[in-house]
Amino acid sequence: MRPLAPDARCAPSRPGRGPWYARRPVTTPSDPPAALREPPPPARRAGKAGSGELVFTRVAGRTVLEKALARSPLKLLAPKNHGQAAWVFVASFGGGLVGGDELNLHARVGRGAAALLSTQASTKVYRSPLVSRQRLEAEVQAGGLLVAIPDPVVCFAGSRYEQDIDVALADDASLVLVDALSSGRSARGERWAFDRYASRVRVSRGGRAVLLDATRLDPAHGALPERMGRFDALATLVALGPRAASAAEALLAPRPPPERRAELVASASPLRGGGAVVRVAGTSVERVAGFLRGALAFLAGELGDDPFARKW
């Protein structure tokens, strides 16, 4: 794990003297030997910019990963293709995003191809005064299908995170997208304790915007634990295009109103040209994951296997 930058806001100081790690130490006879003193805090580090490119192509009735390039700290894992779709898992070196890290990924899904973008585990954002960012730009050509269902983002206390997802679809291309967030490390008492979270999702079809969805959580607008109430996980699900039509239709079907103090609440809205966007809030990540897995059960047929298997 890379060392974290010291948080200057928490450093004790006296007027005119600056933070403790900037002062010259005063040696007295009672000071311990230098070898026994506590080491100084690590120097503030600038984040790293990682980038990647993926190209999926349909060849002889199945999708192949034609191109996969990654620059650290971005890491791409491509398991053996055992179905008609190609799978890629996106990760980062060090087990998460450290202050100032920025990951940019561009993906192109060719005509008639099918691709899955996922993660092996949640995306962890470590505490830092610097903002960590992720950006996904994707293009899906005619008849293609992109399934982007990463695990939830977990923002540690004091962290700052922003992400942008921009998907351009051909007129008859399809998309299944999940954007999910958990309250943090609640088992350690960190519940909605991050300093900033911002996510923007933009989807266009044939050059026309069909969805622009933004989520921003900032304690400057009010204490987050009180605003989020009993919920510990959020998700936005997008199902759009002919290859996701059955899922969109089921999601838009009338359903009874939620019970008082329900452990999961979901609300669906139609999208222009056929499709649905669903916003979900649950009392746990497992509750939200169960809803998503049921809503996206059809993906096993499109991808050759269940993308949620062996995860929860």
Swiss-Prot record:
Could you tell me which HAMAP family the record lists for this protein? UreD (MF_01384)
Keyword terms: Chaperone, Cytoplasm, Nickel insertion
Q: Where in the cell is it found?
A: Cytoplasm
User: What is the name attached to this protein's record?
Assistant: Urease accessory protein UreD
- Which InterPro entries is this protein grouped with? UreD (IPR002669)
- Location (main, coarse): cytoplasm
Give the record's subunit note.
UreD, UreF and UreG form a complex that acts as a GTP-hydrolysis-dependent molecular chaperone, activating the urease apoprotein by helping to assemble the nickel containing metallocenter of UreC. The UreE protein probably delivers the nickel.
Gene (name only): ureD
Q: What role does this protein play?
A: Required for maturation of urease via the functional incorporation of the urease nickel metallocenter.
The GO cellular component terms are: cytoplasm
The UniProt family comment states: Belongs to the UreD family.
Region described as Disordered = 1-50
Superkingdom of origin? Bacteria
Species name: Sorangium cellulosum (strain So ce56) (Polyangium cellulosum (strain So ce56))
Kindly give the PANTHER family that the UniProt entry links to this protein.
Answer: UREASE ACCESSORY PROTEIN D (PTHR33643:SF1)
Molecular function GO terms recorded: nickel cation binding
